[in-house]
Amino acid sequence: MLQPNMPAPNFSGQAVVGKEFETISLSDYKGKWVILAFYPLDFTFVCPTEIIAISDQMEQFAQRNCAVIFCSTDSVYSHLQWTKMDRKVGGIGQLNFPLLADKNMSVSRAFGVLDEEQGNTYRGNFLIDPKGVLRQITVNDDPVGRSVEEALRLLDAFIFHEEHGEVCPANWKPKSKTIVPTPDGSKAYFSSAN
């Protein structure tokens, strides 16, 4: 089972990038933060809301040197057709990140999000650092979508930690107080926070 601080499994596969099919690999993104987001199926109900929400906020991720890749077990042909559908009828339109097609289910299986019985994936979010190490893992059952705000908050927290060495308490947001991870540092935080 994958856990934080483990190397992310490398993968390579066909994706819809813009209006074209391209082969992408995790190694293409070395030196960047990556959110690898799995979703159950194209043409469903919650999935387009997540994909559109993140695509519309892609500039926020790009400013943080973060690439986003969405992945399902659908084919590139299915992905492409979905991008051609208007958002007003359940389509996703033009996206600002790749849609990876995991038709052979190898990527979903490697990341532990494949529902073997159904042949599709759970909603999984994997935050991968610029060295290719898993930093955060979240897996949801199908009915509940992800939060763009929470994805950005987690990304900001890990970037802050990498840059400053301090740790981020519950509900931390940029410019909030952090904790120097020493006995005296934590006392200073707790005395000012409580």
From Swiss-Prot:
Domain Thioredoxin: 2-160
UniProt EC number: 1.11.1.24
Name of one Pfam family that matches: 1-cysPrx_C
Top enzyme class: oxidoreductase
PROSITE patterns according to UniProt: THIOREDOXIN_2
Cellular-component GO terms for this entry: cytosol
UniProt xrefs under InterPro entries: AhpC/TSA, Peroxiredoxin, Peroxiredoxin_AhpC-typ, Peroxiredoxin_C, Thioredoxin-like_sf, Thioredoxin_domain
Record flagged with keyword Cell inner membrane: no
Active-site residues annotated for this sequence: 47
Protein purpose: Antioxidant. Could be involved in protection against reactive oxygen species (ROS) generated by metabolic processes and/or protection of the parasite against ROS released by immune effector cells. Thiol-specific peroxidase that catalyzes the reduction of hydrogen peroxide and organic hydroperoxides to water and alcohols, respectively. Plays a role in cell protection against oxidative stress by detoxifying peroxides and as sensor of hydrogen peroxide-mediated signaling events.
Family under the similarity heading: Belongs to the peroxiredoxin family. AhpC/Prx1 subfamily.
Subunit structure: Homodimer; disulfide-linked, upon oxidation.
Note: The active site is a conserved redox-active cysteine residue, the peroxidatic cysteine (C(P)), which makes the nucleophilic attack on the peroxide substrate. The peroxide oxidizes the C(P)-SH to cysteine sulfenic acid (C(P)-SOH), which then reacts with another cysteine residue, the resolving cysteine (C(R)), to form a disulfide bridge. The disulfide is subsequently reduced by an appropriate electron donor to complete the catalytic cycle. In this typical 2-Cys peroxiredoxin, C(R) is provided by the other dimeric subunit to form an intersubunit disulfide.
PANTHER family in the record: PEROXIREDOXIN 4, THIOREDOXIN PEROXIDASE
Protein known as: Thioredoxin peroxidase
Species name: Fasciola hepatica (Liver fluke)
Organism placement in taxonomy: Eukaryota, Metazoa, Spiralia, Lophotrochozoa, Platyhelminthes
